[in-house]
Amino acid sequence: MVLVYKYFSCENEIENSIKPVINLMESSLLDKTTSNSIVLTTFNDFSNWARLSSLWPLLYGTSCCFIESASLIGSRSDSDRYGLVPRSSPRQADLVITAGTVTMKMAPSLVRLYEQMPEPKYVIAMGACTITGGMFSTDSYSTVRGVDKPIPVDVYLPGCPPKPEAIIDAIVKLRKRVAQETYESKIRLKPGNRFFTSIHQFRFVSNNLTGEYSKQSLRQFTKTELYSTLEVPFDETTDEYKGSAVSFQESMDEGDPVAIDKP
């Protein structure tokens, strides 16, 4: 209520001049409709919205790309503003950023870490070596030609190595994908229903390392051949070396190599 004093001589006029003024704050509350005060959504959308700012990445680096991904923790990139909290345990991580070359011996460990992560989980393939094998993809027998062979990949991030700004852009694209997920898509992407892009066409061969390599006939040299290979002067008549700088001491066993004693 607001008092407006027009005439101070008459009390009746003062009382009649009292006029009610509508409170604007109360009117806004009264004018609000149900659609503006209550948000109607589904549990799936609410779950996606809650997970957008809580993607916890797993620290997994095997090569130089990990140096760029580790720089996200610094103040220059400030990955905390996106809710990225690096974790060392796969059971507390939602995202794994594979940074570096994946070898044949390291692939089973990567699959084991991926299986220990709770659903839903995501993978970002960072760097050329992770996506296609990089410079090791042509003549290397121990490099996996793409991390999407053992585990599924959600976002591919090419580069050698990618900059921290590119990693943030990949995370933003992953957030958009998480926001559009549905329950049917989560069921379809379960481990039992996943289909990988391609498989390796490697074949197993027999092991030729039997330990008999040093005992083959091609590896047996006579003294003359051995000394000529070493380019040391040798007198075949006296069966001795020329010069006093180096003296050779024959071994007791014939199969043992010649011992060299330097003064």
UniProtKB/Swiss-Prot annotation:
The subcellular localization recorded is: Plastid, Chloroplast thylakoid membrane
Q: What's its catalytic activity?
A: a plastoquinone + NADH + (n+1) H(+)(in) = a plastoquinol + NAD(+) + n H(+)(out); a plastoquinone + NADPH + (n+1) H(+)(in) = a plastoquinol + NADP(+) + n H(+)(out)
Bound cofactor: record note: Binds 1 [4Fe-4S] cluster.
Q: Which cofactor does it need?
A: [4Fe-4S] cluster
Cite the EC number: 7.1.1.-
Gene3D superfamilies associated with the record: 3.40.50.12280
- Give the principal location in a single coarse category: plastid
GO MF entry, a single one:
NADH dehydrogenase (ubiquinone) activity
A single Gene Ontology CC annotation of this entry is: respiratory chain complex I
Q: Which domain of life is it from?
A: Eukaryota
Q: Which GO terms describe its biological process?
A: aerobic respiration; electron transport coupled proton transport; photosynthesis, light reaction
Q: How does it sit in the membrane?
A: Peripheral membrane protein
Q: Where does [4Fe-4S] cluster bind?
A: C64, C65, C129, C160
Which family would the database say this protein is a member of? Belongs to the complex I 20 kDa subunit family.
Tell me the function of this protein.
Answer: NDH shuttles electrons from NAD(P)H:plastoquinone, via FMN and iron-sulfur (Fe-S) centers, to quinones in the photosynthetic chain and possibly in a chloroplast respiratory chain. The immediate electron acceptor for the enzyme in this species is believed to be plastoquinone. Couples the redox reaction to proton translocation, and thus conserves the redox energy in a proton gradient.
Name the chain's protein: NAD(P)H-quinone oxidoreductase subunit K, chloroplastic
